[in-house]
Amino acid sequence: MGSDDQSAGDRIQKGFQINYMILRDADSGKIIWQENKDFSAPDQEHEARVPVKILDMRAVSREINFSTIESMENFRLDQKVLFKGRIMEEWFFEMGFVGANTTNTWQSTIEAAPESQMMPAKVLNGNVTIQTSFYDNETLITKSVVRLYYI
């Protein structure tokens, strides 16, 4: 990554903020968890306390509301789910163009792994982190790490 890419990433990151995140049961639309917190701060591990029933759902709808000062040509994210530091799952999401000085809501659906691959909540609790890297094309904007606790 060249210095122009780095300065573009820094510029975008300074004006980028997550306003809230919502997880819903994708089938019923019912809110399971909501947090009005900026999970985009890169130099800290965030925590989320999520109801254990989320593990029994066929699919979860994730809604991210974010604001940006800078425009982005191809906003996308790479999300890794890690168990004790080892990658269990990885997803790639692409939103596309995002205008300058806007607030946007991005909703995507994540389907559950087959039941045979699921681990119980007591094993997962506190051992799962979700590492989300936000990009504009290939330029890294910020990386968020959230540790999950099931309640």
Swiss-Prot record:
One biological process term from GO is: sensory perception of light stimulus
Domain of life where this protein originates: Eukaryota
**InterPro entries per the UniProt record, alphabetical:** Ig_E-set, PDED_dom, PDED_dom_sf, Rhodop-sen_GMP-Pdiesterase_dsu
Per UniProt, subcellular location reads as: Nucleus; Cytoplasm
One Pfam family, short name: GMP_PDE_delta
Main location (coarse class): nucleus
Question: SUPFAM superfamilies under this entry?
Answer: E set domains
> So where does this one cross the membrane?
none
The Gene Ontology CC terms held by the record are: cytoplasm; nucleus
Record keywords: cGMP, Cytoplasm, Nucleus
The entry describes its oligomerization and partners as: Interacts with Pde6.
Record family assignment: Belongs to the PDE6D/unc-119 family.
Protein name, as recorded: Probable cGMP 3',5'-cyclic phosphodiesterase subunit delta
Q: Which species does this protein come from?
A: Drosophila melanogaster
Gene that this polypeptide is encoded by = PrBP
